[in-house]
A protein has these predicted regions:
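Local cysteine-cluster metal-coordination motifs and their immediate loop/turn environment
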Residues: 122, 196, 219-254
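FNR/FR-type flavoprotein reductase catalytic core
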Residues: 77-220
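Short, basic/aromatic-enriched C-terminal tail that caps enzymatic domains
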Residues: 1-3, 246-264
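Ferredoxin-reductase
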Residues: 2-87
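Structural signal for conserved beta-strand scaffold positions within catalytic alpha/beta enzyme cores
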Residues: 11, 60, 163-165, 215, ...
Length: 264
């Protein structure tokens, strides 16, 4: 069972309307040896009425400072409680949780990163990790509602960055795949995180291009450790233990090979 750790807030600030950045530091001697891009943690609101952690993807990991950065949308009372914290406050955290992107499968390739909305933050850690791999070219296409964007400067340090906005106020008008087509982007592998309609389109596109795709699925989670079965997704293969075609996003995922999951 993953343990709960009391983390210290070292930085917290707004990035865009309704978007908050929070950096948390581990207590001495409690940091993990490794954090993979695409993993997440469960952050507990400082409110006794809200017992369940909020699953939030890891935006950045600083192994020297032992700090995790999270960027999240303020979507309800729980995330509003987290966003109200100040530097020096403490936040209880469950994790690190889940399976992330396998850098070894991507190293040495031309890799396309696609992030939509709150699927943008985990792409920063992935871009940073891939930029260290020899012979790896990283192209990041991030999608937003409008020109009130976030993390573009950060991601641009590690990748060739393109953006798409729904209203056309910045970059390509439309979605991330519209930007891919408009700019003639070709890749040898694609990694994506975002809303389900986007992931379905990415899977179809990757199949047409005959390139591997790795998808980070977004789903509501309760426990975060696979016990409640509240975040299952349909899989292509039957699970040898449960004998059903399901996988738990919080434990087997959130990152899956596109061929592993049936998302329509």
């Amino acid at each position: 069972m993953k343990k709960k750790t009391t983390m210290t807030v070292t930085d917290i600030r707004p990035l865009a309307e309704g978007i908050c950045s929070m950096t948390l530091r581990y207590p001495e001697g409690e940091a993990p040896e490794e954090v993979k891009p695409g993993q997440f943690a469960g952050l507990y609101p400082n409110d006794a009425d809200k017992l369940l952690p909020r699953p939030i993807s890891i935006c950045r990991w600083d192994p020297e400072k032992k700090e995790l950065r999270f960027v999240f949308r303020i979507a309800g009372a729980g995330t509003a409680s987290l966003a109200a914290q100040k530097a020096g406050d403490t936040v209880d955290m469950l994790g690190v949780l889940g399976n992330g992107y396998e850098i070894g499968l991507l190293a040495g390739k031309k890799v396309l990163l696609l992030g939509g909305g709150i699927g943008v933050p985990p792409m920063l850690e992935l871009a940073a990790a891939l930029s260290k791999e020899p012979g790896t070219e990283v192209i990041a296409v991030m999608g937003y509602r409008d020109s009130d964007m976030f993390l573009t400067d950060d991601i641009g340090k590690y990748a060739r960055l393109l953006v798409a906005t729904e209203d056309g106020s910045a970059g390509t008008k439309g979605n991330v795949l519209d930007a891919v087509r408009e700019n003639g982007v070709k890749a040898q592998a694609v990694c994506a995180c975002g809303p389900m309609p986007m992931l379905r389109a990415v899977k179809r596109s990757a199949m047409e291009e005959e390139i591997p795709a790795y998808l980070s699925l977004e789903e509501r989670m309760a426990c975060g450790v696979g016990a409640c079965l509240g975040c299952v997704t349909k899989t292509a293969k039957v699970d040898g233990h449960s004998h059903v075609r399901n996988a738990r996003i919080c434990t087997e995922g959130p990152v899956f090979g596109a061929e592993e999951v049936e998302i329509g």
